Amino acid sequence: GFFEKAAFYGGTALRIFHGLQRFSEDLDFSLLEVKPGFSLEPYLKGIEKEFSALGVTVSIEEKYKTAATNVDSAFLKPDTAWKELIIKEILPHESVKMRPGLKIKIEIDKTPPLGFTTEERLLLKPFSFYVKCFTLPDLFAGKMHALLFRKWKGRVKGRDWFDMEWYIRKKIPLNLEHLLIRSLDSGDWKEKSMTKEQFMSLFQNKIQLKLFN
């Protein structure tokens, strides 16, 4: 199945499985190994079939991201699969809380920065099944990478600070090794290692920039 090859991560994973009180527009997945030739196509009919069983008609469209429009997804790479699921029609059903025209962006990193660990999390609604997810320390590392290096109109997105505070309040440890790998992968860090002191220096500099901008 799909979760033998990929894991769920990002803000939506944090909301669904860990109770983050913030909505997210994307479904972000990472392959468990680098595989540039991976395709979502074999899974699309299954997605449409599951929605159809709930009385929901959907279409899944291929989307392309160019450098000129690379704003919202600052770390979306050319080898990231990007699909957009569009809710077309819904039959009345008390368990279906969606509206026609709703769009859900699905991203899959086919050449992911590795060094992360995963765990199986149980999803209860609308059906019970297990989902392979990044562990919290690795999710935290991904969020800190976004906060430190995200290039969005020269600013950090407010959601990054909101999420960071959530991790700190929950006393989630940061996987510094995974943060290092992500930073090397994005080209934002050039050294072979990253100490806690170096990380804190980056973090404090980002806070200072936030305070004065």
Regions flagged by a language model, labelled:
Residues 9-12:
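Glycine-rich beta-strand-to-loop/alpha-helix junction loops that act as flexible
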Residues 1-6, 17-20, 32-213:
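Structured mid-to-C-terminal alpha-helical surface segments
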Residues 24:
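Anion-coordinating catalytic cores for phosphoryl-, nucleotidyl-, and glycosidic chemistry
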